[in-house]
């Protein structure tokens, strides 16, 4: 009994001492934030697991300013210049702020890819891979992308013939995954053809909550490691099922006799020089699917909802599209880039409903560094949280309203800090897929609005009331879909 009481006393003493140290003696003590966040990592974990940390971070920045202490060893920066300071290019003698291992390497057995490799291996992979994401490659990929978008329109026409009430979110997800699947593995997932998700994709619905739980457990390895051991067999079975399917797809892509304008071509050409194993190719292709297709599908759903939620915006965009194109043959990946209001709608969606939403954390290197003029000690986790920054009135007028005009020089938004919007990030690790995402999104919405009249269903009026973990928790987006007369898909 004495030993148990002594143990409890010791634990309580340690916890109280740790809390006092974190709040009042830690190297980050001068940075403001709520007491519980400054004192313990548990407050942050509670906010993350609740799926509403983007609201919490915004509230903190509104109260405390551009720099907030989210946890004892973590800072959030909410300022347009913070992007470059954290993620930007460094001088030759400067060490970059590397990606936080607890966020990017959740499991020890994970294969490394361009997203979680260290600086030098990342650059080694990125150079040959970047060719597949260039403007020229996008033009070469045009027929492939157009084929899937035309099939998307055809399947919507068939679906609307059965019922004008269509689950548009499903079809937007199908077209996004089929396009990226083809450009990653050389073949689609067959979602559009079958009218349903591939099993490989269905399991991604659990990725957000499962992934964020294990990320949070990473702060408590004495809990995480036993759990990983307990569930190792189940997790390995889940992983191997995906790996087997992906590996077979990659084998077929490698055996393809000829060049394709896809994401993998550059790596295949440099495979021997870079000493790339089959699993390295598979890991990067899976990344394109997991990150690229999911975020693109999220953007597509966001654009659709926000357009249909705002009749004025939808009608103005519809007028722009029908004024620009008289027949479907005029619609190409190149021509859809010349629509200023459409571009503004996409940018405003990226601001209002950022697919990334929260921060992608970096680590301050040895010797510390300066961010927004403030010295930050080494081993501090730092990040810019997209949603919170984009919804601050300090940088965007009327931030909680969907106003594409802010990207068209409207005087009402003359003081907006548009450089704060960095959905694809900055620096040597910025997202390669920017050109593809914009091109694909433009083409899909021009053809969708050219072929159909859309109206938001009553049951989806509050669709954007969502929680966010690694991805948004999206409910079905229901839309009334009516084919336009005399338009053939």
Curated annotation (Swiss-Prot):
Enzyme class, spelled out: oxidoreductase
Record's subcellular location: Membrane
Any Pfam family matching the protein: p450
GO cellular component, one term: membrane
SUPFAM superfamilies: Cytochrome P450
Principal location class: membrane
Cross-referenced InterPro entries: Cyt_P450 (IPR001128), Cyt_P450_CS (IPR017972), Cyt_P450_E_grp-I (IPR002401), Cyt_P450_sf (IPR036396), Cytochrome_P450_monoxygenase (IPR050121)
Ligand binding (heme): 431
Domain of life: Eukaryota
Keyword terms, alphabetized: Coiled coil, Glycoprotein, Heme, Iron, Membrane, Metal-binding, Monooxygenase, Oxidoreductase, Transmembrane, Transmembrane helix
Glycosylation sites: 347, 379
Gene3D superfamilies: Cytochrome P450
GO molecular function: heme binding; iron ion binding; monooxygenase activity; oxidoreductase activity, acting on paired donors, with incorporation or reduction of molecular oxygen
Membrane topology qualifier: Multi-pass membrane protein
Listed EC numbers: 1.-.-.-
GO biological process terms held by the UniProt record: mycotoxin biosynthetic process; terpenoid biosynthetic process
Pathway entry: Secondary metabolite biosynthesis; terpenoid biosynthesis
Function of the molecule: Cytochrome P450 monooxygenase; part of the gene cluster that mediates the biosynthesis of paraherquonin, a meroterpenoid with a unique, highly congested hexacyclic molecular architecture. The first step of the pathway is the synthesis of 3,5-dimethylorsellinic acid (DMOA) by the polyketide synthase prhL.
Assigned protein family: Belongs to the cytochrome P450 family.
Stated name of the protein: Cytochrome P450 monooxygenase prhB
Gene designation: prhB
């Amino acid at each position: 009994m004495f030993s148990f009481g002594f143990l409890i006393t010791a634990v309580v003493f340690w916890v109280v001492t740790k809390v006092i140290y974190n709040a009042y003696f830690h190297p980050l003590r001068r940075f403001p934030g709520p007491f519980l966040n400054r004192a313990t990592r548990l407050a942050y974990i509670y906010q993350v697991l609740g799926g509403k940390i983007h609201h919490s971070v915004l509230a903190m920045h509104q109260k405390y300013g551009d720099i907030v202490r989210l946890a004892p060893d973590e800072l959030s920066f909410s300022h347009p210049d913070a992007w470059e300071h954290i993620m930007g290019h460094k001088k030759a003698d400067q060490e970059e702020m590397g990606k936080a291992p607890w966020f990017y390497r959740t499991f020890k057995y994970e294969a490394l890819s361009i997203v979680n490799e260290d600086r030098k291996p990342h650059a080694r992979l990125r150079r040959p891979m970047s060719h597949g994401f260039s403007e020229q490659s996008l033009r070469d990929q045009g027929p492939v992308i157009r084929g899937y978008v035309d099939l998307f329109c055809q399947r919507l026409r068939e679906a609307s013939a059965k019922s004008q009430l269509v689950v548009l979110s499903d079809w937007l997800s199908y077209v996004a995954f089929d396009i990226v699947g083809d450009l990653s593995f050389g073949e689609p997932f067959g979602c559009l053809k079958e009218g349903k998700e591939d099993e490989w994709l269905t399991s991604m619905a659990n990725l957000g909550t499962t992934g964020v739980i294990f990320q949070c457990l990473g702060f408590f390895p004495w809990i995480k490691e036993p759990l990983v051991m307990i569930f190792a067999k189940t997790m390995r079975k889940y992983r191997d099922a995906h790996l087997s399917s992906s590996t077979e797809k990659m084998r077929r892509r490698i055996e393809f006799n000829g060049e394709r304008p896809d994401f993998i071509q550059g790596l295949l050409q440099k495979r021997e020089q870079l000493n790339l194993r089959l699993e390295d190719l598979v890991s990067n292709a899976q990344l394109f699917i997991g990150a690229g297709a999911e975020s693109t599908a999220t953007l597509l759903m966001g654009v659709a909802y926000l357009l249909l939620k705002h009749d004025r915006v939808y009608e103005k965009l519809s007028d722009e599209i029908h004024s620009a194109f008289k027949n479907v043959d005029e619609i190409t990946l190149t021509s859809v880039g010349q629509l200023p209001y459409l571009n503004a709608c996409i940018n405003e969606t990226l601001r209002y409903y950022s697919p990334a939403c929260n921060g992608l954390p970096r680590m301050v290197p040895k010797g510390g560094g300066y961010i927004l003029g403030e010295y930050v000690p080494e081993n501090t986790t730092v990040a810019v949280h997209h949603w919170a920054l984009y919804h601050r009135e300090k940088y965007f007028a009327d931030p909680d309203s969907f106003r594409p005009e802010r990207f068209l020089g409207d005087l009402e938004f003359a003081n907006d800090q548009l450089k704060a919007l960095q959905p694809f990030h900055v620096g040597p690790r910025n997202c390669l897929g920017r050109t593809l995402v914009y091109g694909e999104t433009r083409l899909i919405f021009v053809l969708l609005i050219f072929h159909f009249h859309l109206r938001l269903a009553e049951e989806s009026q509050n669709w954007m009331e969502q929680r966010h973990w690694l991805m948004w928790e999206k409910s079905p987006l229901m839309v009334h879909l009516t084919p336009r007369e005399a338009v053939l898909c």
